[in-house]
Amino acid sequence: MKNYLTLDVGGSAIKYALIQEDLSIIEKSSVPTPMDNLENFIETICQIYDQFQNQIEGIAISMPGIIDPERGYQYTGGALRYITNLDTVQILQERCPTNITIGNDAKCAANAEIGFGNLQDIQDGAVVILGTGIGGCLIKDHKVHTGKHFSAGEFSFIKTNNQDALSWNHAWSTRCGIQGLLERVQEQLESDQKYSGIEIFEMANQGDEKVIAGINAFAKEVATQIFNVHIIFDCEKIAIGGGISAQPLLIDLIKENLNEIYAHLGFDVYHPEIVPCRFRNDANLIGALYQHLQTFKSQD
């Protein structure tokens, strides 16, 4: 069984794992993400490679930013501001002589679902990741749809209010990231007390009606934009990911609000199935591996 080093580069940590082709995770750990400069970032990746170089067939990397996965080229690096117009794979291969692939993090999460998860049986669909912002990906003909400029599915930028279209206040990422959820609950509780996502769902699952109302207000806005994505793209399924997607209450409320939209539409349209992502915290690692395997399978 072949082993692969997979990395999920985030704004605070680089998670890495030694994974076999059958998705067995042999070892997993993390290191802080260098935020100061490119040199330290490259050196950190290479130090991880040094630990496993004699055990692996290649490196698969998930990263933020706008990425051309075929060239291994990054136009932007998301929170990693020192990455701009960078031949990332070429630079890494100078120090790590092995097969290397990189992909956008949300698109890697989608690849995990296409290859091994809850979107294996579709041709067209979407993935919505509810996190700090909104991660997104469109799936066309059973493949991630990158778009001409590799930025298709950047749902974070969707505007939700034309009265304030020039600021981020009503971007989908602001309204429906985790902070947006916390604010809806605080509004219902009429409290300035800060709660975590875990605490909110514990309170909701114990029957706190005000908390449930806050979650429902959040779910209604998520459902509205999911409806818009579907009407534009005609999805068979839409998978919802991110840590809070593990909460059945949230998925149920999103479905209920979507059904209400359909009921008042006045036209018959296909209702895509709404499913949680199978892979949660490991989605980017698994999806990066799927992209890597597909890349070198096509080159054989």
Features from the language model and the residues they span:
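ATP-binding/phosphotransfer module of carbohydrate and carboxylate kinases, centering on a glycine-rich
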Residues: M1-G58, I67-R71, L92-T98, G115-I122, ...
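A cytosolic small-molecule/anion-sensing beta-strand core signal
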Residues: Q20, M63, K140-D141
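Hydrophobic "anchor" residues
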Residues: S24-I25, Q74, V144-H145
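Short hydrophobic alpha-helix segments
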Residues: S29-V31, G78, K148
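A short acidic/small-residue loop/turn micro-motif
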Residues: P32-P34, Y82, S151-E154
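A charged helix-plus-loop insertion that forms the helical arch/lid used to bind
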Residues: Y73-N85
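General beta-strand structural signal in soluble alpha/beta enzymes
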Residues: I100-A106
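Glycine-rich phosphate-binding loop of actin/hexokinase-like ATP-binding domains
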Residues: Q120-S173
